[in-house]
From Swiss-Prot:
Function: F(1)F(0) ATP synthase produces ATP from ADP in the presence of a proton or sodium gradient. F-type ATPases consist of two structural domains, F(1) containing the extramembraneous catalytic core and F(0) containing the membrane proton channel, linked together by a central stalk and a peripheral stalk. During catalysis, ATP synthesis in the catalytic domain of F(1) is coupled via a rotary mechanism of the central stalk subunits to proton translocation. Component of the F(0) channel, it forms part of the peripheral stalk, linking F(1) to F(0).
Membrane-crossing segments per the record: 10-30
Gene: atpF
Chief subcellular location: membrane
Oligomeric form and interacting partners: F-type ATPases have 2 components, F(1) - the catalytic core - and F(0) - the membrane proton channel. F(1) has five subunits: alpha(3), beta(3), gamma(1), delta(1), epsilon(1). F(0) has three main subunits: a(1), b(2) and c(10-14). The alpha and beta chains form an alternating ring which encloses part of the gamma chain. F(1) is attached to F(0) by a central stalk formed by the gamma and epsilon chains, while a peripheral stalk is formed by the delta and b chains.
Entry-linked InterPro entries: ATP_synth_B-like_membr_sf, ATP_synth_b/b'su_bac/chlpt, ATP_synth_F0_bsu_bac, ATP_synthase_B_chain
Family listed: Belongs to the ATPase B chain family.
GO molecular function, one term: proton-transporting ATPase activity, rotational mechanism
Membrane topology classification: Single-pass membrane protein
PANTHER family with a match to the protein in the record: ATP SYNTHASE SUBUNIT B', CHLOROPLASTIC (PTHR33445:SF2)
Gene Ontology CC entries for this record: plasma membrane; proton-transporting ATP synthase complex
Location within or outside the cell: Cell membrane
Protein name, entry field: ATP synthase subunit b
Length: 167
């Protein structure tokens, strides 16, 4: 068994070479790789934090936009409702003005009809009085004085006018 494991100078040189190689690799390879990995991990963590921040900001902006949109919709509804109320009010004013104008026109027409009626009655009374005078002169052969004659005609006209216009 002595031949299988021997502790001669080669063994110690190999052990020393391995140790030196380990220290050289540690200094030139493992340490830069570890630093690179740490930097990369830190960069990834910063990217994740930045992405979360951006996500949070975008959610806040989304909430603000939704709030503004809701406010705009509410304002739009108020404007439409106000426009409808104004239109309804204006329509009512137009209808009211038309009603007033129609009543005024009816009153004017009624007054005009009343004037025409009065005018026709006066003309008719004049014609009736002339007819009554002519009839009275033919019927009454006797001679009446002018005032009695006029009084009789006026009574006839009044009775004829009342009877005629009451119907």
């Amino acid at each position: 068994m002595l031949g299988l494991v021997s502790f001669d100078a080669t063994f110690f040189f190999q052990l020393a070479n391995t140790l030196i190689m380990f220290l050289i690799l540690k200094h030139f390879l493992f340490q830069p790789v570890t630093e690179f990995m740490d930097k990369r991990t830190k960069a990834i963590e910063e990217s994740i934090a930045e992405a979360e921040l951006k996500n949070k900001e975008s959610n806040e902006l989304k909430a603000q936009y939704e709030s503004k949109l809701t406010e705009i919709k509410k304002e739009r509804t108020q404007i439409i409702d106000e426009a409808v109320r104004n239109a309804q009010k204006r329509g009512d004013e137009i209808v009211s003005a038309a009603g007033v104008e129609a009543r005024r026109t009816i009153e004017k027409a009624t007054a005009e009809i009343e004037r025409e009626k009065q005018k026709m009655m006066n003309e008719l009374k004049g014609e009736i009085s002339q007819l009554a005078i002519a009839a009275a002169q033919k019927v009454i052969e006797k001679d009446l004085d002018q005032s009695a004659h006029q009084q009789m005609i006026q009574q006839f006209i009044d009775k004829a006018g009342e009877t005629q216009w009451q119907n």
